[in-house]
From Swiss-Prot:
It comes from Homo sapiens. Gene3D superfamilies: Single helix bin. Residues 1-23 are extracellular. O-glycosylated; required for stabilization and translocation to the plasma membrane. This is FXYD domain-containing ion transport regulator 7. Residues 54-80 are annotated as: Disordered. Regulatory subunit of the sodium/potassium-transporting ATPase which is composed of a catalytic alpha subunit, a non-catalytic beta subunit and a FXYD regulatory unit that modulates the enzymatic activity in a tissue- and isoform-specific way by changing affinities of the Na+/K+-ATPase toward Na(+), K(+) or ATP. GO terms for biological process: positive regulation of sodium ion export across plasma membrane; potassium ion transport; sodium ion transport. One of its GO terms (molecular function) is sodium channel regulator activity. Coiled coil: none annotated.
Amino acid sequence: MATPTQTPTKAPEEPDPFYYDYNTVQTVGMTLATILFLLGILIVISKKVKCRKADSRSESPTCKSCKSELPSSAPGGGGV
């Protein structure tokens, strides 16, 4: 029985390019989704507020496009 004179050396392993830290990926994804969700709500709210301010001051082209969305500006005295 022969014994090896040298200990076998391991070849240097390259890191797997398809290894993902799924916890970090999930955290970043949820953070981005939350930011985009809140940004979308902020944009929708800001357009409604902008339209109401413009409607109370004077007739403007931007508000004319919003008039159909606002219940208080319905023809015939609308309102609630």
